[in-house]
Amino acid sequence: MKFAAIALSIVLIASIVAAQDPAVVNAKTIKVKFENDRVRVMEATLPPGVKEQVHSHPAYVIYVLEGGKYRNYASDGKVTEGEFKDGDVIYRNPITHAAENIGDKPIHLILVELKTEGSAAK
């Protein structure tokens, strides 16, 4: 019985972690383009009116290919609105959130998630 409870806990924890992977829970809008032990590069296209599922990122950089207006829903309940401009490059701290395109055109981004800290070139 104790073993079954432990096994169930491990499965539940693994599903929660996987459920917050942006490329898994938002597979229609986010595609992994490259991944190694230091970074994961994803392409995201969010059509007008679409709201993503809640997901998490480690520290990451956004490169805006095609901007637009968005609404961000943070895990702490804070809701903010903003606008990406074409060509913007933005650093973001780790976050659990969902984003919604509130504009009238698709938002197209490259996301670079940073897996390791202090990996400066020598």
Feature annotation, model-predicted:
Residues A27-K51, P58-I62, V112:
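A short glycine-rich, His/Asp/Glu-containing loop-to-beta-strand
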Residues A5-S15:
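Bacterial N-terminal signal peptides
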Residues E35, D76-P94:
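Short acidic-glycine-tyrosine-enriched beta hairpin
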Residues G67, P94-E117:
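Ligand-binding loop in jelly-roll beta-barrel domains
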Residues H57-D76:
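Glycine- and acidic-residue-biased ligand/ion/polar-headgroup-sensing regions
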Residues G118-K122:
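Extracytoplasmic/periplasmic copper-protein system
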